[in-house]
């Protein structure tokens, strides 16, 4: 009979009853009496068990999954003994002595089990079974996970860092591409929201214009202030955005291209958070009415951040911010859109490319003419946006060769490795509708257009008979001449 006293921390001190309780805890209750009580297996004997002991007589467990589950659980016990520092128990490479070791490694166990859920529908109890999977790295988590199994059956699989890498680097399927797109979209959305919150923080600590006048700037000092310039810059940005999203909508590889857009924009704006927060520059123009707001509550800050985020930070939508100068977000977005239009349209569309970059240059000039940013803000924004776009695509187009020759690339470019490995690299710039639209034939050929058969009148019948007689007479004369 198994007791319910607490199990000692050191497995070497376990009695047979403790081994039986431990087997019940990991979901192997059906073998508790057989192993612990019938064959008198205590803690030390448990640590010495191998797969041969379990599958051969006298134990004779016939289920391979149960054998592996017990062996992996014993492996964690061995790890625990080593951590305790008990020199009486040596660490084995695996439960059976010929497999990979978890000692001093980042390997984990992938545990799959059936979890039973209880639902009440129309007053009746309904039980559903869901297949779950968890990665565990310690004994307590393993035991808790195995105990969740509703039917006592679980699958335990050793999963290593190399296995995770292989899963990420497998060729992309459609589902995997869409999943990456959703992750990239969530990443960019959180980055934009964080940027909006930082914009509120820097506005609350903007330097006083009376104490800190605008800094000397070689461009702003020589270009007069144009009040409507910034609104015109945002209008140009909207035009470029419409062009780009039209291209993206009809592009054959729209999922891959959209994923790259979101991942790049999210990364650049995440970098902008730090550059804005580290150093607060004075306002670039005396026309800007900027005052610090040091006493705002957290709720007010979050409300203002959501206002900026939901309106895309555009002054056309009523967003007014100060202190977010290093570096220019408008220049970043416009430059990134111009790069995407150029990269993902055919090379012979030179007219569109020229039009795009001319608008880009005008937009940058209008930002400076509006005195909304210093020249260094615009220059840094253009440089960072261009370099990030080119570096990311250089890696995306050659990721397989680069990563295969230098494993450190996974550490240096984790975002690019995660999103691009398994992808096809450079994509063909071909266009089509996102969905096939089939229009029924009857829409084009109405019943009114179909030929109608009407009864002939008497006069028309007579004319037809006369014409037929003449044709017969001509054919007979033609035959006589030949004869």
UniProtKB/Swiss-Prot annotation:
Listed Pfam families: PAP2_C (PF14360), SAM_1 (PF00536)
InterPro entries linked to this entry: SAM, SAM/pointed_sf, Sphingomyelin_synth-like, Sphingomyelin_synth-like_dom
Ranges of Basic and acidic residues composition bias in the record: 450-461
Alphabetical keyword list: Lipid metabolism, Membrane, Sphingolipid metabolism, Transferase, Transmembrane, Transmembrane helix
Protein name: Sphingomyelin synthase-related 1
SMART domains: SAM
EC number: 2.7.8.-
Family to which this protein belongs: Belongs to the sphingomyelin synthase family.
GO cellular component labels: endoplasmic reticulum membrane; Golgi membrane; membrane; plasma membrane
Membrane-crossing segments per the record: 182-202, 230-250, 261-281, 349-369, 376-396
Membrane topology: Multi-pass membrane protein
Cytoplasmic face of the membrane: 397-483
Region (Disordered): 450-483
Location relative to the cell: Membrane
Protein's GO biological process: ceramide biosynthetic process; sphingomyelin biosynthetic process
Active site feature: 330, 373, 377
Domain of life, source organism: Eukaryota
GO molecular function ontology, one term from the record: ceramide cholinephosphotransferase activity
The UniProt record lists the keyword S-adenosyl-L-methionine: no
Native organism taxonomy: Eukaryota, Metazoa, Ecdysozoa, Nematoda, Chromadorea
């Amino acid at each position: 009979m198994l007791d319910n006293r607490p199990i000692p921390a050191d497995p070497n001190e376990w009695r047979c009853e403790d081994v039986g309780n431990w087997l019940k805890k990991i979901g192997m209750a059906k073998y508790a009496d057989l192993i612990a009580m019938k064959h008198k297996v205590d803690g030390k004997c448990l640590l010495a068990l191998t797969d041969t002991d379990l599958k051969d007589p006298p134990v004779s467990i016939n289920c391979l999954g149960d054998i592996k589950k017990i062996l992996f659980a014993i492996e964690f016990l061995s790890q625990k003994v080593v951590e305790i520092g008990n020199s009486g128990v040596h660490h084995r490479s695996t439960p059976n002595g010929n497999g990979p070791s978890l000692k001093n490694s980042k390997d984990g166990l992938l545990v799959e089990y059936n979890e039973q859920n209880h639902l009440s529908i129309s007053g009746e109890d309904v039980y559903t079974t869901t297949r779950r999977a968890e990665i565990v790295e310690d004994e307590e988590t393993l035991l808790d996970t195995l105990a969740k199994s509703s039917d006592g059956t679980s699958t335990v699989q050793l999963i290593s860092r190399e296995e995770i890498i292989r899963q990420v680097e497998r060729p992309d399927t459609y589902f995997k591409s869409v999943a990456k797109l959703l992750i990239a979209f969530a990443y960019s959305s959180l980055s934009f929201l964080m940027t909006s919150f930082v914009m509120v923080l820097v506005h609350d600590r903007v330097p006083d214009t009376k104490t800190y006048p605008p800094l000397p700037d070689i461009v702003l000092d020589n270009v007069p202030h144009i009040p409507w310039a910034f609104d015109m810059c945002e209008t140009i940005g909207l035009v470029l955005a419409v062009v780009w999203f039209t291209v993206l909508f009809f592009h054959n590889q729209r999922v891959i291209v959209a994923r790259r857009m979101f991942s790049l924009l999210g990364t650049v704006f995440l970098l902008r958070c730090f550059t804005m927060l580290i150093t607060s520059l004075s306002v670039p123009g005396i026309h800007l009415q900027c005052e610090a707001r040091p006493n705002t509550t957290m709720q007010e800050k979050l409300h203002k951040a959501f206002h900026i985020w939901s309106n895309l930070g555009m002054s056309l939508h009523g967003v007014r911010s100060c202190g977010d100068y290093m570096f220019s977000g408008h220049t970043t977005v416009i430059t990134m859109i111009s790069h995407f239009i150029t990269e993902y349209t055919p090379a012979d569309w030179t007219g569109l490319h020229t039009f795009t970059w001319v608008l880009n240059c005008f937009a940058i000039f209008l930002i400076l003419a509006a005195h909304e940013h210093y020249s260094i803000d615009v220059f840094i924004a253009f440089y960072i946006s261009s370099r990030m776009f080119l570096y990311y695509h250089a890696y995306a187009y050659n990721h397989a060769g680069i990563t295969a020759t230098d494993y450190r690339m996974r550490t240096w470019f984790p975002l690019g490795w995660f999103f691009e490995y398994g992808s096809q690299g450079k994509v063909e710039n071909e266009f089509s509708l996102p969905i096939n639209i089939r229009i029924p034939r009857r829409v084009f050929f109405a019943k009114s257009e179909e030929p109608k058969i009407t009864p002939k009148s008497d006069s028309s019948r007579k004319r037809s008979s006369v014409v037929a007689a003449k044709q017969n007479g001509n054919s007979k004369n033609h035959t006589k001449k030949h004869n």
